[in-house]
């Protein structure tokens, strides 16, 4: 073999090794890749039933339904479309109606999203960019943090109603 052929064989074998390594990494991560959808995107382009994905938006007011066995049903909306969500477990402390939420799980054949985990929006820094952009585009984005450093006009309640402090 000439020098040129040896160099070409070395480059070709290096490319094969790199391609094989990339293929193995992609194969190992295939279960960890989760696609993100808004309710509108999910309505326009339905995901495959059982495929892992994330949905994000606002918890629709008056949609929260708590069952006795820690099962919670609620609706995620982006003000255009809604997605019914079922979750079993403890919800984050910041979870409430009208707030931003991201749920990760799978869409069942009946159209209900079964969430394995639910993340509540803390403030706009933690909202996925896609959700924030969709909400801003629809005019329902709520700016937070405008009153930082200012005391609240409503005093904090220190005792339950009806209790007397001694």
Curated annotation (Swiss-Prot):
Cellular compartments annotated: Cell inner membrane
Transmembrane regions: 8-28
Gene Ontology terms describing biological process: cytochrome complex assembly
GO cellular component, one term: plasma membrane
Periplasmic side stretches: 29-166
Residue numbers on the Cytoplasmic membrane side: 1-7
GO MF entries: heme binding; metal ion binding
Its membrane topology: Single-pass type II membrane protein
Pfam families (alphabetical): CcmE (PF03100)
Entry keyword GTP-binding: no
Binding site for heme: 122, 126
Database matches in SUPFAM superfamilies: Heme chaperone CcmE
Primary location: membrane
UniProt keyword terms in alphabetical order: Cell inner membrane, Cell membrane, Cytochrome c-type biogenesis, Heme, Iron, Membrane, Metal-binding, Signal-anchor, Transmembrane, Transmembrane helix
Region (Disordered): 139-166
Disulfide partners: none
Similarity section: Belongs to the CcmE/CycJ family.
Record function comment: Heme chaperone required for the biogenesis of c-type cytochromes. Transiently binds heme delivered by CcmC and transfers the heme to apo-cytochromes in a process facilitated by CcmF and CcmH.
Name of the featured protein: Cytochrome c-type biogenesis protein CcmE
Organism the protein comes from: Methylocella silvestris (strain DSM 15510 / CIP 108128 / LMG 27833 / NCIMB 13906 / BL2)
Encoding gene per record: ccmE
């Amino acid at each position: 073999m000439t020098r040129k052929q040896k160099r070409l064989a070395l480059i070709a074998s290096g490319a094969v090794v790199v391609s094989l390594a990339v293929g193995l990494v992609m194969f190992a991560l295939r279960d960890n890749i989760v696609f993100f959808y808004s309710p509108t995107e999910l309505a326009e382009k339905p995901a495959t039933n059982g495929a892992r994905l994330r949905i994000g938006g606002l918890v629709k007011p008056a949609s929260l339904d708590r069952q006795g066995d820690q099962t919670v049903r609620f609706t995620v909306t982006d003000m255009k479309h809604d997605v019914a969500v079922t979750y079993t477990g403890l919800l984050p402390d910041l979870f409430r109606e009208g707030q931003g939420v991201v749920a990760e799980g799978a869409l069942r054949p009946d159209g209900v999203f079964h969430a394995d985990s639910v993340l509540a929006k803390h403030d706009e820094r933690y909202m996925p960019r896609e959700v924030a952009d969709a909400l801003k585009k629809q005019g329902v984005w709520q700016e937070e943090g405008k009153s930082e450093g200012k005391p609240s006009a409503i005093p904090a309640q220190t005792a339950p109603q009806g209790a007397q402090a001694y």
